[in-house]
Amino acid sequence: MKNWWLLFIVFVSCSKNAQVYAPVGGLSEEEMGVSKNRAKQLNTMEREQIQEWISKQKEKFYPTQLNYWSNIENLEQRKKKQDGEQVSFQYELYDFDLQKFYEKPKIYKNAPLGKFEELDAIEDAVRYLNPDEETTLLVPSVLAYGTYGDGDQIPYDMPLIIKLKLIK
């Protein structure tokens, strides 16, 4: 019986609490909090800048539930296309000085809704557009390419103007 207790004590005393590390390349809890706070402040600042930009335009823009603006009033009250429906559309990206990022529009043919690898604001707006209808979207960077940019011409933390057209 003494041997069992002795063995038990040896095993228990040898086991150490495993240290918990943040994932390689990951952020600690404190860093996550700082990052979250930065994103929140950036989003608030960009929303204010976009609203100021809107106030200087002749065209009206309307906020959406997804946190972007469209020049179509009551866009989200229209009939919504469902996941799986195929749509064809094109869009062009601009900064708020109306400088175009790419010469040619990005064109997608027969893209199934719900499986987009595009910006969330584009997929959301496409769901409500009618064939051959166009809209202009004002999108904060958090809904655009965020803190990384697109890896090509769009820098990080860049709010975008998106001119979107549903082809069919």
Range-by-range predicted roles:
Residues 1-14:
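Sec-dependent bacterial lipoprotein signal peptides
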Residues 14-168:
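Cross-family detector of peptidyl-prolyl cis-trans isomerase
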